[in-house]
Amino acid sequence: MASSGGGNTGAGGTSGLGLGLGLGLCMGEATGDAEEEAAAAEAVGRLATSLWLRLRGWEAVLAAAQRLLVWEKPLHSLVTAATLNGLFWLLSSSSLRPFFLLSISLLTYFLLDLWHPRFLPDVSAPPPEEPHSDSEGAGSGAQPHLLSVPELCRYLAESWLTFQIHLQELLQYKRQNPAQFCARVCSGCAVLAVLGHYVPGIMISYIVLLSILLWPLVVYHELIQRMYTRLEPLLMQLDYSMKAEADALHHKHDKRKRQGKNAPPAGDEPLAETESESEAELAGFSPVVDVKKTALALAITDSELSDEEASILESGGFSVSRATTPQLTDVSEDLDQQSLPSEPEEALSRELGDGEETELAPPEDLLSAPPALSKQALDTEEEGAADKETLLQLSSPLHFVNTHFNGAGSPQEGVKCPPGGPVETLSPEAVSGDLMAPSSTLSPQLCLAESGPVTLLSPSVLPSLPQDSPQALTAPEEEEALTTEDFELLDQGELEQLNAELGLGPEMPPKPPDVLPPPPLGPDSHSLVQSDQEAHAVVEP
Protein backbone atom coordinates (compact mmCIF):
# COMPACT_ATOMS: atom_id res chain seq x y z
CA MET A 1 0.00 0.00 0.00
CA ALA A 2 2.82 2.33 0.87
CA SER A 3 4.61 1.56 -2.35
CA SER A 4 1.46 2.20 -4.35
CA GLY A 5 0.95 5.48 -2.50
CA GLY A 6 4.54 6.40 -3.26
CA GLY A 7 4.04 5.55 -6.94
CA ASN A 8 0.98 7.74 -7.10
CA THR A 9 2.86 10.55 -5.44
CA GLY A 10 5.67 10.19 -7.97
CA ALA A 11 3.25 10.19 -10.91
CA GLY A 12 1.50 13.25 -9.51
CA GLY A 13 4.82 15.01 -9.07
CA THR A 14 5.86 14.19 -12.64
CA SER A 15 2.60 15.47 -14.11
CA GLY A 16 2.84 18.61 -12.00
CA LEU A 17 6.40 19.18 -13.21
CA GLY A 18 5.33 18.74 -16.85
CA LEU A 19 2.45 21.18 -16.39
CA GLY A 20 4.78 23.67 -14.79
CA LEU A 21 7.25 23.38 -17.65
CA GLY A 22 4.46 23.87 -20.21
CA LEU A 23 3.19 26.95 -18.42
CA GLY A 24 6.72 28.25 -18.18
CA LEU A 25 7.30 27.80 -21.91
CA CYS A 26 4.00 29.51 -22.76
CA MET A 27 4.80 32.39 -20.47
CA GLY A 28 8.27 32.58 -21.97
CA GLU A 29 6.87 32.71 -25.50
CA ALA A 30 4.35 35.38 -24.52
CA THR A 31 7.07 37.39 -22.86
CA GLY A 32 9.28 37.01 -25.94
CA ASP A 33 6.48 38.18 -28.25
CA ALA A 34 5.80 41.18 -26.05
CA GLU A 35 9.48 42.07 -26.01
CA GLU A 36 9.68 41.77 -29.80
CA GLU A 37 6.64 44.02 -30.25
CA ALA A 38 8.09 46.58 -27.87
CA ALA A 39 11.43 46.49 -29.71
CA ALA A 40 9.68 46.89 -33.10
CA ALA A 41 7.64 49.85 -31.83
CA GLU A 42 10.78 51.45 -30.45
CA ALA A 43 12.59 50.93 -33.76
CA VAL A 44 9.66 52.46 -35.69
CA GLY A 45 9.68 55.47 -33.39
CA ARG A 46 13.43 56.05 -33.81
CA LEU A 47 13.24 55.73 -37.62
CA ALA A 48 10.19 58.04 -37.83
CA THR A 49 11.96 60.65 -35.71
CA SER A 50 15.07 60.54 -37.90
CA LEU A 51 13.00 60.90 -41.07
CA TRP A 52 11.02 63.77 -39.61
CA LEU A 53 14.25 65.60 -38.72
CA ARG A 54 15.40 65.31 -42.33
CA LEU A 55 12.08 66.30 -43.89
CA ARG A 56 11.09 69.04 -41.48
CA GLY A 57 11.83 71.74 -44.08
CA TRP A 58 9.77 70.09 -46.82
CA GLU A 59 6.31 70.15 -45.26
CA ALA A 60 4.81 72.53 -47.86
CA VAL A 61 6.29 70.59 -50.78
CA LEU A 62 4.99 67.28 -49.45
CA ALA A 63 1.52 68.75 -48.85
CA ALA A 64 1.40 70.14 -52.42
CA ALA A 65 2.54 66.77 -53.82
CA GLN A 66 -0.22 65.01 -51.88
CA ARG A 67 -2.84 67.44 -53.19
CA LEU A 68 -1.66 66.76 -56.72
CA LEU A 69 -1.68 62.98 -56.25
CA VAL A 70 -5.20 62.86 -54.77
CA TRP A 71 -6.55 65.20 -57.46
CA GLU A 72 -7.81 67.76 -54.98
CA LYS A 73 -7.45 70.32 -57.75
CA PRO A 74 -8.23 68.42 -60.96
CA LEU A 75 -6.72 71.01 -63.32
CA HIS A 76 -3.34 71.08 -61.58
CA SER A 77 -3.29 67.30 -61.28
CA LEU A 78 -4.13 66.92 -64.97
CA VAL A 79 -1.28 69.27 -66.01
CA THR A 80 1.16 67.41 -63.77
CA ALA A 81 0.12 64.01 -65.16
CA ALA A 82 0.48 65.26 -68.76
CA THR A 83 3.95 66.65 -67.99
CA LEU A 84 5.15 63.42 -66.46
CA ASN A 85 3.80 61.39 -69.38
CA GLY A 86 5.58 63.66 -71.87
CA LEU A 87 8.90 63.43 -70.06
CA PHE A 88 8.63 59.67 -69.80
CA TRP A 89 8.00 59.15 -73.51
CA LEU A 90 10.68 61.74 -74.43
CA LEU A 91 13.33 59.93 -72.42
CA SER A 92 12.23 56.52 -73.65
CA SER A 93 12.39 57.56 -77.33
CA SER A 94 15.78 59.35 -77.11
CA SER A 95 19.08 57.69 -77.96
CA LEU A 96 20.82 59.04 -74.86
CA ARG A 97 22.98 56.83 -72.73
CA PRO A 98 22.08 55.85 -69.17
CA PHE A 99 25.08 57.79 -67.79
CA PHE A 100 23.70 60.96 -69.29
CA LEU A 101 20.34 60.37 -67.61
CA LEU A 102 22.06 59.74 -64.28
CA SER A 103 24.08 62.97 -64.54
CA ILE A 104 20.94 64.98 -65.39
CA SER A 105 19.19 63.58 -62.35
CA LEU A 106 22.05 64.48 -60.01
CA LEU A 107 22.20 68.03 -61.47
CA THR A 108 18.49 68.51 -60.82
CA TYR A 109 18.86 67.40 -57.20
CA PHE A 110 21.83 69.79 -56.67
CA LEU A 111 19.91 72.76 -58.09
CA LEU A 112 16.88 72.05 -55.89
CA ASP A 113 19.09 71.86 -52.82
CA LEU A 114 20.76 75.13 -53.78
CA TRP A 115 17.58 77.09 -54.56
CA HIS A 116 15.56 75.73 -51.69
CA PRO A 117 16.31 78.56 -49.19
CA ARG A 118 15.41 81.26 -51.75
CA PHE A 119 12.13 79.96 -53.24
CA LEU A 120 10.80 77.86 -50.34
CA PRO A 121 10.43 79.48 -46.87
CA ASP A 122 12.11 77.77 -43.94
CA VAL A 123 9.46 76.38 -41.63
CA SER A 124 10.68 76.01 -38.07
CA ALA A 125 9.67 72.73 -36.50
CA PRO A 126 9.02 71.95 -32.83
CA PRO A 127 11.23 69.47 -30.99
CA PRO A 128 10.60 65.88 -32.14
CA GLU A 129 9.01 64.49 -28.97
CA GLU A 130 5.79 63.07 -30.45
CA PRO A 131 6.08 63.22 -34.25
CA HIS A 132 2.87 61.24 -34.82
CA SER A 133 0.54 63.55 -32.89
CA ASP A 134 -2.38 65.24 -34.64
CA SER A 135 -1.61 68.71 -33.30
CA GLU A 136 1.78 68.73 -34.94
CA GLY A 137 0.31 67.48 -38.21
CA ALA A 138 -2.21 70.31 -38.19
CA GLY A 139 0.51 72.91 -37.49
CA SER A 140 2.88 71.56 -40.15
CA GLY A 141 0.93 73.08 -43.03
CA ALA A 142 -0.92 69.91 -44.20
CA GLN A 143 -4.68 69.71 -44.60
CA PRO A 144 -6.74 67.73 -42.02
CA HIS A 145 -7.73 65.10 -44.61
CA LEU A 146 -4.15 64.69 -45.86
CA LEU A 147 -1.17 63.06 -44.21
CA SER A 148 1.06 65.32 -42.16
CA VAL A 149 4.83 65.00 -42.22
CA PRO A 150 5.05 63.07 -38.91
CA GLU A 151 2.34 60.66 -40.06
CA LEU A 152 4.04 60.23 -43.42
CA CYS A 153 7.34 59.57 -41.67
CA ARG A 154 5.73 56.98 -39.43
CA TYR A 155 4.14 55.14 -42.41
CA LEU A 156 7.46 55.17 -44.24
CA ALA A 157 9.25 53.80 -41.18
CA GLU A 158 6.70 50.99 -40.76
CA SER A 159 7.01 50.09 -44.45
CA TRP A 160 10.80 50.01 -44.24
CA LEU A 161 10.77 47.79 -41.15
CA THR A 162 8.24 45.43 -42.79
CA PHE A 163 10.50 45.15 -45.83
CA GLN A 164 13.47 44.37 -43.62
CA ILE A 165 11.52 41.67 -41.76
CA HIS A 166 10.47 39.98 -45.03
CA LEU A 167 14.06 40.19 -46.32
CA GLN A 168 15.37 38.51 -43.17
CA GLU A 169 12.77 35.74 -43.46
CA LEU A 170 13.76 35.19 -47.10
CA LEU A 171 17.44 34.89 -46.20
CA GLN A 172 16.60 32.49 -43.38
CA TYR A 173 14.50 30.39 -45.77
CA LYS A 174 17.46 30.36 -48.21
CA ARG A 175 19.79 29.03 -45.53
CA GLN A 176 17.33 26.40 -44.33
CA ASN A 177 15.92 25.26 -47.74
CA PRO A 178 18.38 26.12 -50.52
CA ALA A 179 16.86 23.74 -53.10
CA GLN A 180 13.33 25.07 -52.72
CA PHE A 181 14.61 28.63 -52.74
CA CYS A 182 16.52 28.02 -55.99
CA ALA A 183 13.50 26.41 -57.66
CA ARG A 184 11.18 29.25 -56.71
CA VAL A 185 13.62 31.96 -57.81
CA CYS A 186 14.20 30.24 -61.16
CA SER A 187 10.45 29.87 -61.78
CA GLY A 188 9.89 33.57 -60.98
CA CYS A 189 12.68 34.67 -63.35
CA ALA A 190 11.27 32.44 -66.11
CA VAL A 191 7.83 34.06 -65.75
CA LEU A 192 9.38 37.53 -65.98
CA ALA A 193 11.41 36.50 -69.06
CA VAL A 194 8.27 35.22 -70.83
CA LEU A 195 6.41 38.39 -69.87
CA GLY A 196 9.31 40.58 -71.15
CA HIS A 197 9.36 38.61 -74.39
CA TYR A 198 5.70 39.36 -75.14
CA VAL A 199 5.39 42.78 -73.41
CA PRO A 200 8.06 45.45 -74.01
CA GLY A 201 9.97 46.69 -71.00
CA ILE A 202 9.06 50.30 -71.72
CA MET A 203 5.36 49.41 -71.42
CA ILE A 204 5.97 47.69 -68.09
CA SER A 205 7.79 50.81 -66.86
CA TYR A 206 4.89 53.00 -67.99
CA ILE A 207 2.40 50.79 -66.16
CA VAL A 208 4.48 51.12 -63.00
CA LEU A 209 4.54 54.93 -63.37
CA LEU A 210 0.76 55.11 -63.85
CA SER A 211 0.25 52.90 -60.82
CA ILE A 212 2.33 55.26 -58.68
CA LEU A 213 0.37 58.27 -59.97
CA LEU A 214 -3.14 56.79 -59.73
CA TRP A 215 -2.92 54.62 -56.62
CA PRO A 216 -3.27 57.55 -54.14
CA LEU A 217 -6.33 58.75 -56.09
CA VAL A 218 -7.99 55.30 -55.90
CA VAL A 219 -7.30 54.90 -52.18
CA TYR A 220 -8.27 58.46 -51.23
CA HIS A 221 -11.67 58.48 -53.03
CA GLU A 222 -12.44 54.76 -52.40
CA LEU A 223 -13.06 54.08 -56.07
CA ILE A 224 -12.77 50.30 -55.72
CA GLN A 225 -15.57 50.13 -53.11
CA ARG A 226 -17.84 52.35 -55.23
CA MET A 227 -17.17 50.32 -58.34
CA TYR A 228 -17.90 47.06 -56.53
CA THR A 229 -21.17 48.47 -55.13
CA ARG A 230 -22.37 49.33 -58.62
CA LEU A 231 -21.19 46.11 -60.23
CA GLU A 232 -22.48 43.77 -57.52
CA PRO A 233 -26.07 43.45 -58.94
CA LEU A 234 -24.69 42.69 -62.40
CA LEU A 235 -22.28 40.12 -61.00
CA MET A 236 -25.06 38.43 -59.01
CA GLN A 237 -27.31 38.31 -62.09
CA LEU A 238 -24.48 36.83 -64.12
CA ASP A 239 -23.82 34.25 -61.42
CA TYR A 240 -27.50 33.23 -61.30
CA SER A 241 -27.74 32.98 -65.07
CA MET A 242 -24.64 30.79 -65.20
CA LYS A 243 -26.05 28.53 -62.49
CA ALA A 244 -29.37 28.27 -64.35
CA GLU A 245 -27.59 27.32 -67.56
CA ALA A 246 -25.48 24.76 -65.74
CA ASP A 247 -28.59 23.25 -64.13
CA ALA A 248 -30.35 23.12 -67.52
CA LEU A 249 -27.38 21.35 -69.09
CA HIS A 250 -27.19 18.90 -66.22
CA HIS A 251 -30.94 18.24 -66.49
CA LYS A 252 -30.66 17.57 -70.22
CA HIS A 253 -27.74 15.24 -69.62
CA ASP A 254 -29.70 13.27 -67.02
CA LYS A 255 -32.71 13.13 -69.33
CA ARG A 256 -30.62 11.69 -72.14
CA LYS A 257 -29.25 9.09 -69.77
CA ARG A 258 -32.76 8.06 -68.73
CA GLN A 259 -33.89 7.91 -72.35
CA GLY A 260 -30.87 5.74 -73.17
CA LYS A 261 -31.75 3.34 -70.38
CA ASN A 262 -35.42 3.18 -71.41
CA ALA A 263 -34.66 2.84 -75.14
CA PRO A 264 -37.04 0.46 -77.03
CA PRO A 265 -35.80 -2.78 -78.58
CA ALA A 266 -34.42 -2.89 -82.09
CA GLY A 267 -37.74 -4.01 -83.67
CA ASP A 268 -39.83 -1.19 -82.16
CA GLU A 269 -40.13 2.25 -83.63
CA PRO A 270 -38.15 4.95 -81.84
CA LEU A 271 -40.13 7.48 -79.94
CA ALA A 272 -40.05 11.16 -80.86
CA GLU A 273 -37.60 13.11 -78.70
CA THR A 274 -39.00 16.31 -77.30
CA GLU A 275 -37.70 18.87 -74.88
CA SER A 276 -40.73 18.62 -72.60
CA GLU A 277 -41.15 16.10 -69.81
CA SER A 278 -43.21 12.94 -70.15
CA GLU A 279 -46.86 12.86 -69.12
CA ALA A 280 -46.09 10.77 -66.08
CA GLU A 281 -43.58 13.34 -64.80
CA LEU A 282 -45.88 16.27 -65.54
CA ALA A 283 -48.78 14.57 -63.77
CA GLY A 284 -46.83 14.70 -60.53
CA PHE A 285 -46.83 18.49 -60.61
CA SER A 286 -50.57 18.88 -61.37
CA PRO A 287 -52.78 18.95 -58.24
CA VAL A 288 -55.64 16.47 -57.80
CA VAL A 289 -58.93 18.39 -57.54
CA ASP A 290 -62.02 16.97 -55.84
CA VAL A 291 -65.22 18.02 -57.66
CA LYS A 292 -67.45 18.02 -54.57
CA LYS A 293 -65.03 20.04 -52.47
CA THR A 294 -64.54 22.54 -55.28
CA ALA A 295 -68.29 23.02 -55.74
CA LEU A 296 -68.76 23.47 -51.99
CA ALA A 297 -65.97 26.05 -51.84
CA LEU A 298 -67.49 27.95 -54.77
CA ALA A 299 -70.92 27.92 -53.12
CA ILE A 300 -69.50 29.26 -49.88
CA THR A 301 -67.59 31.93 -51.78
CA ASP A 302 -70.73 32.98 -53.68
CA SER A 303 -72.76 33.22 -50.47
CA GLU A 304 -70.28 35.55 -48.84
CA LEU A 305 -71.05 39.24 -48.76
CA SER A 306 -68.92 41.74 -50.55
CA ASP A 307 -66.98 44.42 -48.68
CA GLU A 308 -69.48 47.12 -49.72
CA GLU A 309 -72.51 45.13 -48.50
CA ALA A 310 -70.77 44.30 -45.24
CA SER A 311 -69.98 47.99 -44.62
CA ILE A 312 -73.64 48.96 -45.32
CA LEU A 313 -74.98 46.34 -42.90
CA GLU A 314 -72.46 47.28 -40.22
CA SER A 315 -73.39 50.97 -40.51
CA GLY A 316 -77.08 50.00 -40.02
CA GLY A 317 -76.44 48.23 -36.72
CA PHE A 318 -75.90 44.68 -37.95
CA SER A 319 -72.89 42.63 -36.96
CA VAL A 320 -71.90 40.86 -40.17
CA SER A 321 -69.57 37.89 -40.31
CA ARG A 322 -68.37 36.16 -43.44
CA ALA A 323 -70.50 33.20 -44.65
CA THR A 324 -72.96 33.68 -41.75
CA THR A 325 -76.36 35.26 -41.24
CA PRO A 326 -76.34 38.93 -40.17
CA GLN A 327 -77.29 39.32 -36.53
CA LEU A 328 -78.80 42.29 -34.77
CA THR A 329 -76.62 44.12 -32.29
CA ASP A 330 -77.50 46.31 -29.34
CA VAL A 331 -77.98 49.28 -31.66
CA SER A 332 -81.21 47.79 -33.08
CA GLU A 333 -82.85 46.90 -29.77
CA ASP A 334 -84.99 50.04 -29.88
CA LEU A 335 -86.38 48.88 -33.25
CA ASP A 336 -87.42 45.55 -31.69
CA GLN A 337 -89.16 47.33 -28.83
CA GLN A 338 -91.16 49.55 -31.19
CA SER A 339 -92.04 46.82 -33.70
CA LEU A 340 -95.18 44.67 -33.60
CA PRO A 341 -95.02 41.00 -32.60
CA SER A 342 -93.79 38.68 -35.27
CA GLU A 343 -95.79 35.89 -36.88
CA PRO A 344 -94.35 33.08 -34.67
CA GLU A 345 -95.28 35.05 -31.55
CA GLU A 346 -98.85 35.66 -32.81
CA ALA A 347 -99.25 31.96 -33.65
CA LEU A 348 -97.99 31.04 -30.18
CA SER A 349 -100.40 33.48 -28.55
CA ARG A 350 -103.32 32.06 -30.60
CA GLU A 351 -102.45 28.52 -29.57
CA LEU A 352 -102.14 29.49 -25.93
CA GLY A 353 -105.43 31.44 -26.11
CA ASP A 354 -107.30 28.55 -27.71
CA GLY A 355 -105.84 26.13 -25.24
CA GLU A 356 -106.87 28.34 -22.34
CA GLU A 357 -110.42 28.64 -23.68
CA THR A 358 -110.62 24.90 -24.19
CA GLU A 359 -109.31 24.12 -20.74
CA LEU A 360 -111.40 26.75 -19.00
CA ALA A 361 -114.69 25.83 -20.77
CA PRO A 362 -117.04 24.81 -17.93
CA PRO A 363 -119.47 21.89 -18.17
CA GLU A 364 -123.20 22.40 -18.72
CA ASP A 365 -124.16 21.82 -15.11
CA LEU A 366 -121.93 24.70 -14.02
CA LEU A 367 -123.53 27.12 -16.54
CA SER A 368 -127.06 26.66 -15.26
CA ALA A 369 -126.75 27.71 -11.62
CA PRO A 370 -123.44 28.62 -9.99
CA PRO A 371 -123.21 26.54 -6.84
CA ALA A 372 -121.52 27.71 -3.71
CA LEU A 373 -117.84 27.03 -4.15
CA SER A 374 -115.79 25.98 -1.23
CA LYS A 375 -112.73 27.84 -0.13
CA GLN A 376 -110.42 25.01 -1.14
CA ALA A 377 -111.85 24.90 -4.67
CA LEU A 378 -111.43 28.67 -4.98
CA ASP A 379 -107.80 28.43 -3.91
CA THR A 380 -107.18 25.67 -6.46
CA GLU A 381 -108.76 27.68 -9.25
CA GLU A 382 -106.83 30.77 -8.19
CA GLU A 383 -103.53 28.91 -8.34
CA GLY A 384 -104.38 27.45 -11.77
CA ALA A 385 -105.32 30.88 -13.10
CA ALA A 386 -102.10 32.41 -11.70
CA ASP A 387 -99.99 29.68 -13.36
CA LYS A 388 -101.70 30.19 -16.71
CA GLU A 389 -101.30 33.95 -16.47
CA THR A 390 -97.61 33.52 -15.69
CA LEU A 391 -97.26 31.20 -18.70
CA LEU A 392 -98.94 33.75 -20.93
CA GLN A 393 -96.72 36.54 -19.59
CA LEU A 394 -93.59 34.54 -20.35
CA SER A 395 -94.70 33.32 -23.79
CA SER A 396 -96.51 36.29 -25.32
CA PRO A 397 -95.33 39.91 -25.68
CA LEU A 398 -96.84 42.59 -23.47
CA HIS A 399 -99.63 44.64 -25.16
CA PHE A 400 -101.56 47.44 -23.53
CA VAL A 401 -105.03 48.44 -24.81
CA ASN A 402 -106.25 51.60 -23.12
CA THR A 403 -109.89 51.19 -24.12
CA HIS A 404 -111.17 51.82 -20.59
CA PHE A 405 -110.20 55.49 -20.94
CA ASN A 406 -112.52 55.95 -23.97
CA GLY A 407 -115.84 55.15 -22.24
CA ALA A 408 -117.95 57.65 -20.27
CA GLY A 409 -118.17 55.44 -17.24
CA SER A 410 -121.76 54.25 -17.75
CA PRO A 411 -123.25 51.46 -19.81
CA GLN A 412 -124.94 52.24 -23.09
CA GLU A 413 -128.68 51.91 -23.52
CA GLY A 414 -128.53 49.35 -26.29
CA VAL A 415 -126.61 46.86 -24.21
CA LYS A 416 -128.69 44.15 -22.57
CA CYS A 417 -127.77 42.54 -19.33
CA PRO A 418 -127.22 38.82 -19.13
CA PRO A 419 -130.08 36.65 -17.82
CA GLY A 420 -128.10 35.69 -14.80
CA GLY A 421 -128.36 39.24 -13.48
CA PRO A 422 -127.51 42.80 -14.47
CA VAL A 423 -124.06 44.24 -14.48
CA GLU A 424 -124.83 46.08 -11.25
CA THR A 425 -125.29 42.76 -9.46
CA LEU A 426 -121.69 41.80 -10.09
CA SER A 427 -119.44 42.31 -7.15
CA PRO A 428 -116.93 45.15 -7.54
CA GLU A 429 -114.11 42.75 -6.68
CA ALA A 430 -115.03 40.45 -9.58
CA VAL A 431 -115.48 43.33 -12.00
CA SER A 432 -112.22 44.96 -10.98
CA GLY A 433 -110.41 41.63 -11.01
CA ASP A 434 -111.73 40.73 -14.44
CA LEU A 435 -111.17 44.12 -16.03
CA MET A 436 -107.86 44.77 -14.33
CA ALA A 437 -106.32 41.50 -15.46
CA PRO A 438 -102.73 41.80 -16.68
CA SER A 439 -102.37 43.03 -20.19
CA SER A 440 -100.45 39.90 -21.10
CA THR A 441 -103.60 37.79 -20.44
CA LEU A 442 -106.10 39.93 -22.37
CA SER A 443 -103.83 40.97 -25.22
CA PRO A 444 -104.29 37.87 -27.48
CA GLN A 445 -108.08 37.89 -27.06
CA LEU A 446 -108.43 41.63 -27.62
CA CYS A 447 -106.20 41.47 -30.69
CA LEU A 448 -108.36 38.67 -32.12
CA ALA A 449 -111.56 40.58 -31.32
CA GLU A 450 -110.31 43.73 -33.07
CA SER A 451 -108.71 42.08 -36.11
CA GLY A 452 -111.25 39.35 -36.97
CA PRO A 453 -114.93 38.55 -36.44
CA VAL A 454 -116.27 38.48 -32.92
CA THR A 455 -115.79 35.06 -31.35
CA LEU A 456 -117.59 33.63 -28.36
CA LEU A 457 -115.55 34.01 -25.21
CA SER A 458 -115.90 31.53 -22.43
CA PRO A 459 -117.64 32.60 -19.25
CA SER A 460 -114.40 32.10 -17.42
CA VAL A 461 -113.25 35.48 -18.67
CA LEU A 462 -116.09 37.25 -16.83
CA PRO A 463 -117.47 34.78 -14.25
CA SER A 464 -120.91 35.66 -12.88
CA LEU A 465 -120.41 35.00 -9.21
CA PRO A 466 -123.15 35.64 -6.64
CA GLN A 467 -123.02 38.83 -4.69
CA ASP A 468 -122.82 37.13 -1.31
CA SER A 469 -119.80 34.96 -2.24
CA PRO A 470 -116.72 36.18 -0.39
CA GLN A 471 -114.39 36.34 -3.42
CA ALA A 472 -112.09 39.20 -2.70
CA LEU A 473 -109.37 37.64 -4.80
CA THR A 474 -106.07 39.33 -4.35
CA ALA A 475 -103.75 39.34 -7.31
CA PRO A 476 -100.03 38.59 -6.94
CA GLU A 477 -97.54 41.32 -6.30
CA GLU A 478 -96.44 41.31 -9.93
CA GLU A 479 -100.06 41.81 -11.07
CA GLU A 480 -100.45 44.71 -8.67
CA ALA A 481 -97.26 46.29 -9.97
CA LEU A 482 -98.47 45.94 -13.57
CA THR A 483 -101.91 47.37 -12.78
CA THR A 484 -100.29 50.22 -10.88
CA GLU A 485 -98.12 51.02 -13.88
CA ASP A 486 -100.91 50.60 -16.47
CA PHE A 487 -103.72 52.55 -14.73
CA GLU A 488 -103.67 55.95 -13.14
CA LEU A 489 -104.69 56.40 -9.52
CA LEU A 490 -108.08 57.94 -8.70
CA ASP A 491 -108.77 60.21 -5.77
CA GLN A 492 -111.50 59.57 -3.19
CA GLY A 493 -114.06 61.80 -4.93
CA GLU A 494 -113.85 60.00 -8.25
CA LEU A 495 -114.01 56.67 -6.43
CA GLU A 496 -117.26 57.61 -4.67
CA GLN A 497 -118.75 58.89 -7.96
CA LEU A 498 -117.98 55.58 -9.69
CA ASN A 499 -119.53 53.62 -6.80
CA ALA A 500 -122.69 55.73 -7.03
CA GLU A 501 -122.96 55.21 -10.79
CA LEU A 502 -122.55 51.45 -10.41
CA GLY A 503 -125.20 51.32 -7.65
CA LEU A 504 -122.83 50.10 -4.97
CA GLY A 505 -123.96 51.11 -1.49
CA PRO A 506 -122.02 51.52 1.72
CA GLU A 507 -123.11 48.03 2.81
CA MET A 508 -120.59 46.46 0.39
CA PRO A 509 -117.54 44.92 2.04
CA PRO A 510 -114.53 47.24 2.09
CA LYS A 511 -111.96 46.80 -0.61
CA PRO A 512 -108.40 45.91 0.10
CA PRO A 513 -106.17 49.00 0.26
CA ASP A 514 -103.92 47.72 -2.51
CA VAL A 515 -106.72 46.97 -5.03
CA LEU A 516 -107.51 49.83 -7.38
CA PRO A 517 -111.13 50.90 -8.12
CA PRO A 518 -112.80 49.45 -11.21
CA PRO A 519 -112.29 51.52 -14.33
CA PRO A 520 -115.25 52.83 -16.31
CA LEU A 521 -116.89 50.36 -18.61
CA GLY A 522 -115.95 51.02 -22.21
CA PRO A 523 -117.14 49.54 -25.46
CA ASP A 524 -114.78 46.58 -25.06
CA SER A 525 -116.26 45.66 -21.70
CA HIS A 526 -119.79 45.82 -23.10
CA SER A 527 -118.77 43.56 -25.95
CA LEU A 528 -117.39 41.08 -23.44
CA VAL A 529 -120.65 41.16 -21.43
CA GLN A 530 -122.70 40.69 -24.60
CA SER A 531 -120.58 37.72 -25.64
CA ASP A 532 -121.07 36.18 -22.17
CA GLN A 533 -124.85 36.66 -22.47
CA GLU A 534 -124.92 34.92 -25.84
CA ALA A 535 -122.93 32.02 -24.42
CA HIS A 536 -125.49 31.54 -21.61
CA ALA A 537 -128.34 31.69 -24.14
CA VAL A 538 -126.74 28.98 -26.24
CA VAL A 539 -126.16 26.61 -23.31
CA GLU A 540 -129.56 26.96 -21.49
CA PRO A 541 -131.85 25.37 -24.20
Curated annotation (Swiss-Prot):
Keywords: Autophagy, Endoplasmic reticulum, Membrane, Phosphoprotein, Transmembrane, Transmembrane helix. GO terms for biological process: collagen catabolic process; endoplasmic reticulum organization; reticulophagy. Residues 249-282, 331-389, 403-440, 459-481, 496-541 are annotated as: Disordered. The chain crosses the membrane at residues 75-91, 99-115, 199-219. A motif (LIR motif) lies at residues 485-490. The keyword Transmembrane applies. This is Reticulophagy regulator 2. It comes from Rattus norvegicus.
